[in-house]
């Protein structure tokens, strides 16, 4: 008797995507401040119901194809669905813009967001099954964005309300990007300068680890908004006592308290990553290095540091992603960044303006995480070789 094995993950994603097709694909509103009316795919293009049925049948068939061939088919179909969703959203916005007023806005609906997320999850699951090599996985993930980026730069998506917000605020967006990157690297670099030596010191001075980690744990538990607020008064008093600090850009609000707070939040993962990375090295390895005649400095530079590097990079990845997200809150004290767009959108009830600030933050976090994943995986491959 022949048994068919089905890919349960792909089948579940297919079911959820079918449910997403029943939700509004886009939302159409007469202006940016009014709640939009949901439009389904079959309302926009009645003939698309047959395309959806065809794609669903092909996707279902891929669930039963065994091995790598099935995964490749699943990747192609899921990527096709994602590209089709992006292209369809742009075409729907253009179609509605031709029939509506210049103030009308076409936003992405819940059906689009859910279906796109599920298609990307299906792509990720298929890539995981296709290859185990980190570089190939990374390249397969990156190629998913090629066609959507081409659609973006070709102008296909220009009539979406999100793109209209970008066109109206391009200078503000560029400034926000520069400020957000300044917050990111301006916090991570000093944190590295402080955290790495502090972690090494804690490793060699185990008696002091408890006090250091207790202090850093307390800092980590303070809510970000509270810590930003606590730094305003001392910094303002410092600038009042020493006015020349103001010429250096130091103030009670703005970048200075934001950078100090972000550095403080970054210290615990970095210090702990250094200590854990050095502690996980087997003692047999250190004894072998000592037996070879290596000095303490040589053992640290040529044995301990390379072996601890993957663990440290994982901690640095956490810090980078954490800082990308927390920099959004820094806009509350005038530090700028994408958080300024988010809070402006919330205050004016403009969801598309909120998305204009949120989406780049998500993209930065995902890219940062992907780059560190690739680097860590390549280090493991090199070590195994």
UniProtKB/Swiss-Prot annotation:
Residue spans, topological domain Cytoplasmic: 1-5, 66-69, 128-137, 202-224, 269-322, 367-385
Periplasmic membrane side: 27-44, 91-106, 159-180, 246-247, 344-345
Pfam families with a match to the protein in the record: BPD_transp_1 (PF00528)
Query: Biological process GO annotation list?
Result: amino acid transport; amino-acid betaine transport; glycine betaine transport; transmembrane transport
Per UniProt, subcellular location reads as:
Cell inner membrane
Instruction: Name where it mostly resides.
Output: membrane
Show the stretches that span the lipid bilayer: 6-26, 45-65, 70-90, 107-127, 138-158, 181-201, 225-245, 248-268, 323-343, 346-366
Topological type in the membrane: Multi-pass membrane protein
Supply the alphabetized keyword list. Amino-acid transport, Cell inner membrane, Cell membrane, Membrane, Transmembrane, Transmembrane helix, Transport
Any one GO cellular component localisation term in the record:
ATP-binding cassette (ABC) transporter complex, substrate-binding subunit-containing
The protein's induction, as recorded, is: Expression is sigma S-dependent. Induced by both osmotic shock and entry into stationary phase.
> Boundaries of each ABC transmembrane type-1 domain copy?
177-372
Q: What does this protein do?
A: Part of an ABC transporter complex involved in low-affinity glycine betaine uptake. Probably responsible for the translocation of the substrate across the membrane.
Q: Which family does it belong to?
A: Belongs to the binding-protein-dependent transport system permease family. CysTW subfamily.
- Assembly information from the UniProt record: The complex is composed of two ATP-binding proteins (YehX), two transmembrane proteins (YehW and YehY) and a solute-binding protein (YehZ).
UniProt-recorded name of the protein = Glycine betaine uptake system permease protein YehY
Species name for this entry?
Answer: Escherichia coli (strain K12)
Per the UniProt record, the lineage of the source organism begins with:
Bacteria, Pseudomonadati, Pseudomonadota, Gammaproteobacteria, Enterobacterales
């Amino acid at each position: 008797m022949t048994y068919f094995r089905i890919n349960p993950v792909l089948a579940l994603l297919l079911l959820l995507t079918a449910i997403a097709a029943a939700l509004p694909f886009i939302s159409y509103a007469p202006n940016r401040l009014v709640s939009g009316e949901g439009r389904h795919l079959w309302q926009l293009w009645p003939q698309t119901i047959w395309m959806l049925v065809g794609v669903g049948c092909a996707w279902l068939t891929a669930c039963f194809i065994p091995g790598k061939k099935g995964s490749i088919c699943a990747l192609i179909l899921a990527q096709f669905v994602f590209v089709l969703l992006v292209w369809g959203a742009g075409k729907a916005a253009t179609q509605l813009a031709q029939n509506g007023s210049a103030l009308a806005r076409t936003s992405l609906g819940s059906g689009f967001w859910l279906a796109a997320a599920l298609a990307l999850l299906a792509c990720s699951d298929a890539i995981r099954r296709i290859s185990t090599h980190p570089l190939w996985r990374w390249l397969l993930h990156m190629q998913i964005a090629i066609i959507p980026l081409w659609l973006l730069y070709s102008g296909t998506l220009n009539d979406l309300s999100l793109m209209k917000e970008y066109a109206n605020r391009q200078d503000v967006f560029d400034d926000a990007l520069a400020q957000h990157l300044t917050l990111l690297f301006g916090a991570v670099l000093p944190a590295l300068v402080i955290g790495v030596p502090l972690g090494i010191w804690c490793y060699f001075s185990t008696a002091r680890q408890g006090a250091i980690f207790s202090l850093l744990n307390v800092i980590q538990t303070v809510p970000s908004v509270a810590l930003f607020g606590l730094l305003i008064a001392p910094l303002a008093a410092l600038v009042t006592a020493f006015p020349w600090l103001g010429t250096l850009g130091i103030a009670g609000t703005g970048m200075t308290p934001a950078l100090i707070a972000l550095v403080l939040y970054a210290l615990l993962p970095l210090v702990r990553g250094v200590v854990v990375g050095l502690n996980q090295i087997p003692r047999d390895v250190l004894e072998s290095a000592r037996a070879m005649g290596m000095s303490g400095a040589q053992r640290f530079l040529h044995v301990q540091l390379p072996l601890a590097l993957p663990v440290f990079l994982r901690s640095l990845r956490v810090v980078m992603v954490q800082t990308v997200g927390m920099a959004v809150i820094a806009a509350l004290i005038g530090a700028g960044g994408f958080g300024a767009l988010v809070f402006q959108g919330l205050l004016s009830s403009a969801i598309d303006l909120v998305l204009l600030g949120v989406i780049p933050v998500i993209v930065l976090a995902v890219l940062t995480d992907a780059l560190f994943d690739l680097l860590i995986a390549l280090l493991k491959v090199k070590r195994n070789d």
